Every structure is written in C-alpha cells, then in structure tokens.
Amino acid sequence: MAITSKYSNKQIEQMLTEMVDVLDKHRAPADLSLMLVGNIATNVLNQEVPAEQRQIIAEKFAQALLSSLDKPKTH
C-alpha cells in the first residue's frame, strides 16, 4: 500500500505470504479474511498507537487502502 517504506519488499512479501498461508490453511472466505485483517488493524491501532494519533492514522490507512484497490475496467 505504501509508496515508500522503511521495510524491505522482501520482508513485506515474506510476512504477507505467511499470513495468506494461514488464511488458506483455514479456507477462510473473503468476508472472514477481511474481518480478521480489520481486527488486526484495530488491535494494532489500539495497542501500539497513542490515543491522540489513532484517528488520523486510521484515516490515512483507509485512504491508502482505497487508493490501492484495482479500478474496475470500463469498456
């Protein structure tokens, strides 16, 4: 989602692969996968981000998510 990151692509891809493997192992459908990812994001925000910064970080996260979605193809 991020254009620039302090984390390497290799590190990100490795962790993403491991997380997707867990979802695949449990045959999680899209709605359950999204629920879990949303809960992880909420937990990280609540546990790791100072209360006064949570709203702005959540808004930036939501904007980054929306901007990273594939756009529907139009004919």
Curated annotation (Swiss-Prot):
InterPro entries, sorted: UPF0352, YejL_sf
Cited Pfam families: DUF1414
Family: Belongs to the UPF0352 family.
Record protein name field: UPF0352 protein VF_1649
Source species of the chain: Aliivibrio fischeri (strain ATCC 700601 / ES114)
Native organism taxonomy: Bacteria, Pseudomonadati, Pseudomonadota, Gammaproteobacteria, Vibrionales
